């Protein structure tokens, strides 16, 4: 039953990859490329989450939390000299956010918070005012709001139950943008589109599609493929730049990608692209299981013999070898590759090893990506 499930899952993964490859061969430019001048920027900040129900940082184990509490209270005009704080309702957190391109002051962002100390849960807490800075050290946003946590943590004196991660959460729309990123989009005459998956065929096809549009609208060529990732677009003199990009990003192009096999060794997931080919190769698959069991015996001395208790080791070694199976794989198509692997009853972990060996033998005509 398990072997049938493994075969079904592998076949489903390959069929799904083949469906994606054929269904998404034609895509809009906005779905496969982005404007170089319109990239995202990362923001980061340090703050405090308050209002926790005894699940915050222990101030003895997290001295930076104690320092932050005192600094915050002093900024609010409250003196903290001569007193020791023993609260467990506050947690020090790292706050991160992504600033999208062309974001204007007053817009809101989602932020993510993560505990820095030994807090056990951020559920029910509130992030107090935290400034978010970019890589240049400038403050671009300020975050504050209630923290939403997906997991839960319950514990008693002798048992504890955890589900999900309770030491990290999100503050939806918790940050307000205070500073606009400098942008030369409106003043630019040359724009660069960057492919998310670099490929020369796709880049050349994108430039050709843009030039066909430009020939009909402006009577000339405006695009040129610079390399496998970048396509240069020159703004016509009488064109409105925003209108031009709106038309360009909705053009439909034929996308291409190299043959690729993606393997995640931790989860056993294997995704095989439709264009993967395997030269004729023989594969032998078999397993050897060795089990070592230790069953020591305690030998007690006779009464009044002045002997000592002895430890007598007892080791049992068993070896079991499953008969190896030989199959001829000729991957003229993706279906034949899957059928060949399934015919010898290979489990997902065995398929990973076989694919790596086929690649080492030079018979796998595809890029092997290990995650």
Swiss-Prot record:
Keywords assigned by UniProt, alphabetized: Bacterial flagellum, Periplasm, Signal
Pfam (any one): FlgI
Assembly, per entry: The basal body constitutes a major portion of the flagellar organelle and consists of four rings (L,P,S, and M) mounted on a central rod.
HAMAP family membership: FlgI
GO terms under cellular component: bacterial-type flagellum basal body, distal rod, P ring; outer membrane-bounded periplasmic space
Functional description taken from the UniProt entry: Assembles around the rod to form the L-ring and probably protects the motor/basal body from shearing forces during rotation.
BP GO terms, sorted: bacterial-type flagellum-dependent cell motility
Gene from which the chain derives: flgI
Signal peptide: 1-25
Protein's recorded name: Flagellar P-ring protein
GO MF term set: structural molecule activity
UniProt subcellular location: Periplasm; Bacterial flagellum basal body
Predominant subcellular localization, coarse grouping: periplasm
PANTHER family: FLAGELLAR P-RING PERIPLASMIC PROTEIN FLGI (PTHR30381), FLAGELLAR P-RING PROTEIN (PTHR30381:SF0)
Organism: Sinorhizobium medicae (strain WSM419) (Ensifer medicae)
NCBIfam families, alphabetized: PRK05303.1 (NF003676)
Protein family per UniProt: Belongs to the FlgI family.
